[in-house]
Each structure stands twice: as C-alpha cells, then as structure tokens.
C-alpha cells in the first residue's frame, strides 16, 4: 500500500524519535520537535491510520505509539536519511587497523571491534572458508613414520595446517618433490578447485614425481575444511546488548542465546548476505529466532571475489542512518586491505 507524503513524514519522524528516546511517541511530541507542518489533530488522525495499516502500534494506553517490524521495514527501505561518517569516525576505523598486524585474522578481529564500538551494538564477522581462498604455497613435511604435516599458505595470509597419516614411511625428499610439483601446478587456485578438478587431472596424466598418484588422494582429502568449524567467526560487542535490551529481559536472554548458537550464526551469515550492497534483516523476516532484532549485513571481497561477510546485530530501534553507512564504509576498507594482502 502506497503511503501519502504526510503519512511517510510522520512515520519517519516517529521511528527516529523512538530510536532516539526509546519511549512511545505521541502527536504532541511530533508536532513540537519535528517540522512536519501539520496540526497535532491531523497528526493524531494520521497516527491512527498508520496503526490501522500495521506500521505502528500503541504500546500503552497513554496514546504513544512505537514502530512495528513492518514500520521499520518501510523506514529502512525508503525513508531513512543516511548520515556520512565524520572524518574523525573514519580516522578511528583506520587507526584500529593500523594497530593490528596485517594478517587476515587480525584484520577481521579489528573489524568486529570497529563495528561493535561505533554502532554500539554487537558485531559478527565471518572469515573465509579455506575453500574460498586461493593457494599461495604448499609445503609437505615429514613428521614421523607415515605422518606428514601439510602447510597451506593462502593468498589472504591465512596459514592452514593439516596432518596426513599413511600406512608406510615417506621420505622428506619424496615430499619435497611432491610439494614442488603441486606449487608449479595448483598455485593461485582455490582449494575446492584443487581438490575436485586439478589433482584428479594431474593423477590421470601420470606426469608427477614418483609416488604422487599414491599420495595425491590423501592430500586432496586433507585440504578440505570442516564445514562445521566455527573458528572463522569473530564476535564482539555483546556488552552493548545489555544496554540495548536492559528493559527487555526476555528479549535479552533470547538474543544472547542466539550468540551461543555459533553454527546457526555462521550458516545465517553465509546464506543471507547479498552478493552486492548492504542488506537489512528486521525481525522474523530473516528467521523465527530473530524476533525483536535487526541485522545489517554485507560482504567483503578479495579482488572481485566475495570471501566473507560481516554484520551488526542490535535492537530494531537501531540508529540506521549511522549503522548503514558504517558497515558500507568498513566493508570497502576491509576489501581493499585483504586485496592488498593477497598480492
């Protein structure tokens, strides 16, 4: 249903007043604090109509209203005025990264801190799966008997260690030859491509060093990442939720429980983040577990390739006009840094 300009102006003012003050909003407040150009009586009439349409609801008998999920949805989609980050805020973000070592995990830790601190909400950053990163170098090292340590150095700066066990002894010289052969042929490809296509093709050609076809299947299997691992999930700002939901104990308990379900968060941030742009999930339009919560998400890239995602999690009365540009600016900065790390 299309809203008239006056309905849109009143809904916009009501959402912003409620975000600012966290109290039900009445016609008198809107008339006095916002330049809507309407009398209190007309505003009261419009508020009643907005309530009938499901955009706002009366929380108490006092007459004040608060936005519904539908009201927030319309506000975010078409009414919000985005504020540009101040120069000081941009400097603060950049300074946080300068304090970190330029490794992927350190960049993602800094990202979670920045988002939580400046949004005054919780933050989640999902690092790349090993299969989405590209290989820079592989090293096979003999440990003991049939045990081999495989070290995968990825373009992003991530270093993965995998133990491989064989039923027979393998010399370090053989492992050196296989390492060199793999580096010559699979460097620059992602792990999934190496596992599913390149190593099988190399085995069929039978051109590798002695023993390669015998060892290759185990090497390919060991390259795989555990899809249930949550080691690449970075969370910060949970303390902000205590302030955000201090008057809503049941809601606070539900959202803190959500952060205990790290596998759910990982899957959610893998599935709900768009290929481009910033996406806002309001309440149960994302999942039944998210009632009363807003999640703002986006992805970050290495070059042109999307390798991970990030998000801000907080109450629906979030300061959208600051949170949306914050996550957009941060994702672009992170993408630039990770792309440089990969070169």
UniProtKB/Swiss-Prot annotation:
The keyword Repeat does not apply. InterPro entries: GAF-like_dom_sf, HrcA, HrcA_C, WH-like_DNA-bd_sf, WH_DNA-bd_sf, WHTH_transcript_rep_HrcA_IDD. SUPFAM superfamilies: GAF domain-like, Winged helix' DNA-binding domain. GO terms for biological process: negative regulation of DNA-templated transcription. One of its GO terms (molecular function) is DNA binding. Keywords: Repressor, Stress response, Transcription, Transcription regulation. The keyword Signal does not apply. Belongs to the HrcA family. Negative regulator of class I heat shock genes (grpE-dnaK-dnaJ and groELS operons). Prevents heat-shock induction of these operons. This is Heat-inducible transcription repressor HrcA. It comes from Leptospira biflexa serovar Patoc (strain Patoc 1 / Ames).
């Amino acid at each position: 249903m299309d809203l008239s300009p006056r309905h849109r102006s009143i809904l916009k003012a009501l959402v912003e007043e409620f975000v600012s003050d966290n109290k039900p909003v009445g016609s008198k407040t809107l008339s006095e604090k916002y330049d809507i150009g309407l009398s209190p009586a007309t505003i009261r009439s419009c508020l009643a109509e907005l309530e009938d349409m499901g955009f706002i609801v009366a929380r108490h008998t006092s007459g004040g209203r608060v936005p519904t999920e539908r009201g927030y949805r319309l506000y975010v989609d078409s009414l919000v005025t985005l504020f540009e980050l101040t120069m000081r805020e941009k400097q603060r973000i950049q300074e946080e990264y300068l304090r970190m070592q330029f490794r992927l995990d350190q960049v993602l830790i800094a990202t979670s801190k920045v988002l939580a601190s400046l949004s005054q909400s919780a933050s989640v950053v999902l690092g790349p799966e090993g299969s989405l990163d590209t290989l820079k170098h592989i090293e096979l090292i003999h440990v003991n008997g049939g045990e081999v340590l495989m070290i995968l150095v990825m373009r992003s700066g991530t270093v993965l260690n995998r133990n491989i066990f064989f039923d027979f002894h393998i010399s370090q010289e053989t492992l050196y030859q296989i390492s060199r052969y793999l580096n010559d042929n699979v460097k620059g490809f992602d792990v999934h491509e190496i596992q599913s296509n390149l190593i099988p093709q190399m085995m069929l050609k039978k051109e590798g060093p002695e023993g390669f076809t015998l060892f290759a299947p185990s090497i390919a299997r060991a390259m795989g990442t555990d899809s249930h691992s949550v080691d690449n999930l970075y969370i910060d700002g949970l303390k902000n939720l205590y302030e955000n939901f201090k008057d809503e104990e049941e809601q606070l308990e539900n959202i803190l429980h959500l952060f205990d379900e790290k596998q759910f968060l990982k899957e959610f941030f893998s599935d709900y983040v768009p290929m481009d742009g910033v996406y806002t999930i309001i309440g149960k339009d994302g999942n039944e577990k998210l009632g009363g919560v807003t999640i703002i998400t986006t992805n970050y890239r290495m070059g042109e390739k999307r390798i991970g995602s990030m998000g801000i999690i907080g109450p629906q009365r979030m300061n959208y006009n600051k949170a949306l540009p914050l996550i957009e600016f941060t994702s672009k900065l992170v993408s630039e840094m990770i792309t440089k790390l990969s070169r």
